[in-house]
């Protein structure tokens, strides 16, 4: 019961408050509208009282009338009324002022000016006479009097910015493309060869030659046999049986030998070569080839050289062995 009564009181109070607000808004709007209706009437009445009779006849604006009222400077004016003769004087004064404003140069006397080009005084007419004269007068500029005609007729050179450089005409996208370049790719390591040829040279001393008969005896003692392609071969069996381990050829083209004329034959050197991989152990085969080359060099009085025709060194021997290991690893 108490809750229902409280709810009713709240609703009634809210309605009363809303009614008071609406009544206040309606009252204030009514007063404001009446205030705005009265203002234009008061303004028109005040403007009608302040506007003189001369202004009404001539149609001069209100601002100009206020700035030209002479009533305050004349002591004969009465505070209550204004004499009609003052309006006539005021109107005539304004007529004179207007006529003077229309022609401000009529009372100016002509002034003579000295022209440096004509060496005489030239009267300067008033602006009105100049306007009434020729519509297109010729004006001489003293700054152009001493300029040669060649300079006037010569075409002017274009400014630097009239022709932009080619570097500025290039698109931004190109300069960005040039700046951001991909990193150079590292060259890929060459794949290990699956086969190689090891070469040794046995050459005579500088300026010498190796005799054919002496060379043939040394080759036979080292286990070489004359065979295919008219060159000598070293087989697994020194008697000439089994696969070929390495071969020996003449350094002079065509690289072959003629066994029947070996006694009449001479050469600056011979070449021993071995293919890797080969039959058996390639490392042992290379060791046997190196021993055979050293033996032949001792027999004929020559020296052993590598594949670059340089003296054989322990470092070069290790290089040969490394090449053998690489090839065997590639074929594993």
UniProtKB/Swiss-Prot annotation:
UniProt keyword annotation of Nucleus present: no
UniProt key word S-adenosyl-L-methionine: no
Residue ranges with Basic and acidic residues bias: 40-51, 93-105
Family matches, as Gene3D superfamilies: ZipA, C-terminal FtsZ-binding domain
Highest taxon, organism lineage: Bacteria
Membrane topology: Single-pass type I membrane protein
Matching InterPro entries: Cell_div_ZipA (IPR011919), ZipA_FtsZ-bd_C (IPR007449), ZipA_FtsZ-bd_C_sf (IPR036765)
GO biological process, one term: FtsZ-dependent cytokinesis
Chief location bin: membrane
Sequence segments annotated as region (Disordered): 40-189
Disulfide bridges in this chain: none
GO cellular component entries: cell division site; plasma membrane
Residues annotated as transmembrane: 7-27
Keyword annotations of the record: Cell cycle, Cell division, Cell inner membrane, Cell membrane, Membrane, Transmembrane, Transmembrane helix
Recorded coiled-coil stretches: none
Residues in the Periplasmic compartment per record: 1-6
Family note: Belongs to the ZipA family.
Subunit structure: Interacts with FtsZ via their C-terminal domains.
HAMAP family xrefs: ZipA (MF_00509)
Function of the protein: Essential cell division protein that stabilizes the FtsZ protofilaments by cross-linking them and that serves as a cytoplasmic membrane anchor for the Z ring. Also required for the recruitment to the septal ring of downstream cell division proteins.
Protein's name in the database: Cell division protein ZipA
Organism from which the protein derives: Pectobacterium atrosepticum (strain SCRI 1043 / ATCC BAA-672) (Erwinia carotovora subsp. atroseptica)
């Amino acid at each position: 019961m108490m809750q229902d009564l409280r709810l009713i009181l709240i609703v009634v109070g809210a309605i009363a408050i809303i009614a008071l607000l609406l009544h206040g808004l309606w009252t204030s709007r009514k007063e404001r509208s009446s205030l705005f209706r009265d203002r234009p009437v008061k303004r028109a009445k005040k403007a009608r009282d302040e506007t003189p009779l001369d202004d009404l006849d001539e149609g001069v604006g209100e601002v100009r009338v206020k700035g030209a009222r002479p009533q305050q400077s004349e002591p004969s004016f009465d505070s209550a009324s204004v004499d009609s003769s003052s309006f006539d004087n005021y109107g005539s004064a304004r007529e004179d002022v207007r006529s003077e404003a229309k022609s401000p140069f009529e009372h100016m006397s002509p002034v003579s000016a000295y022209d440096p080009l004509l060496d005489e005084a030239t009267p300067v007419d008033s602006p009105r006479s100049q306007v009434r004269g020729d519509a297109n007068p010729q004006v001489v500029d003293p700054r152009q009097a001493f300029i040669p005609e060649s300079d006037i007729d010569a075409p002017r050179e274009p400014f630097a910015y009239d022709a932009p450089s080619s570097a500025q005409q290039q698109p931004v996208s190109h300069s960005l493309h040039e700046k951001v370049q991909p990193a150079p790719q590292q060259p890929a390591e060459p794949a290990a060869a699956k086969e190689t040829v090891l070469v040794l040279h046995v050459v005579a001393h500088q300026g010498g030659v190796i005799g054919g008969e002496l060379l043939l005896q040394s080759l036979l003692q080292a286990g070489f046999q004359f065979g295919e392609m008219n060159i000598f071969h070293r087989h697994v069996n020194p008697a000439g049986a089994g696969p070929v381990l390495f071969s020996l050829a003449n350094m002079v083209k065509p690289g072959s030998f003629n066994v029947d004329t070996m006694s009449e034959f001479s050469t600056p050197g011979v070449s021993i070569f071995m293919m890797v991989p080969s039959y058996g152990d390639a490392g042992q085969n290379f060791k046997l080839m190196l021993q055979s080359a050293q033996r032949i060099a001792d027999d004929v009085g020559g020296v052993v050289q590598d594949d670059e025709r340089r003296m054989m060194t322990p470092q070069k021997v290790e290089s040969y062995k490394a090449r053998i290991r690489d090839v065997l690893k590639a074929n594993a």
